[in-house]
């Protein structure tokens, strides 16, 4: 997968394929912009392919719904990949502003340096979390959260989920707690 927005869209594609247990999926770090800046070859015609049947199990270990998050507040590490202004409720983007209780704000842009994932050492210093922690990432619609999911996986975290509904769901459900 690749895109032109520092891996935000591509990361969601990779995560989604992992959810469907696709055996071989990856993301072009730096995206199409880096590829073309390096003057690498580009095709302009549609790729021809033969359809096939992929019958793999769904990997439910990497997805979360609001129920799991709500039941585990205070027991899991919740990472909000949105901007600080979204996290603080200044930019609400839902019926309510703020964030999920106990969430840590690590803006997904901090995963990147000049459009590429930071090296493992820099990412590890950003995510100073127990490697065995149960982690859920979220944002507004699970795109930025998927980028953070991949960053965490890149540096060896095993128990990471993306909350698919993210703030778009949580912030609009008036029965869910908000800080």
Go through the PLM ranges and name each one.
Residues 1-2, 134-137:
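A short, small-residue-rich loop immediately preceding and capping a beta-strand
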Residues 1-68, 143-160, 166:
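Thiolate-centered catalytic microenvironments shared by cysteine-dependent enzyme domains
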Residues 5, 82, 109:
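Anionic group-transfer/hydrolysis microenvironments
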Residues 32-101, 175-179:
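Active-site neighborhoods of enzymes that stabilize oxyanions during catalysis
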Residues 35-38, 113-117, 170-173:
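Short, charged, surface-exposed secondary-structure boundary motifs
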Residues 74-79, 131-134, 158:
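Short coil/turn segments at beta-strand junctions that form active-site/ligand-binding loops
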Residues 104-135:
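Helix-loop module immediately N-terminal to the HCX5R catalytic loop
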Residues 161-179:
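Cysteine-dependent PTP/DSP-like catalytic domain, specifically the C-terminal lobe
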């Amino acid at each position: 997968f690749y895109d032109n927005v520092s891996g935000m869209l591509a990361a969601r594609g990779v995560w989604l394929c992992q959810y469907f247990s696709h055996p071989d999926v990856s993301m072009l770090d730096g995206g199409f912009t880096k590829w073309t800046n390096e003057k690498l070859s580009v095709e302009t015609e549609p790729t021809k392919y033969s359809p096939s049947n992929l019958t793999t199990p769904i990997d439910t270990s990497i997805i979360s719904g609001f129920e799991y998050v709500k039941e585990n507040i205070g027991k899991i590490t919740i990472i909000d990949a949105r901007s600080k202004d979204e996290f603080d409720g200044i930019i609400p983007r839902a019926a309510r502003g703020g964030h999920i209780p106990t969430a840590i704000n690590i803006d997904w842009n901090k995963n990147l340096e000049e459009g590429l994932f930071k090296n493992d050492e820099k990412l590890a210093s950003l995510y100073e979390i127990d490697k065995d922690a149960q982690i859920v990432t979220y944002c507004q619609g699970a795109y930025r959260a998927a980028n953070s999911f991949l960053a965490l996986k890149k540096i060896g975290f095993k128990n990471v989920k993306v909350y698919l509904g993210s703030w778009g769901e949580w912030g609009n459900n008036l029965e869910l707690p908000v800080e």
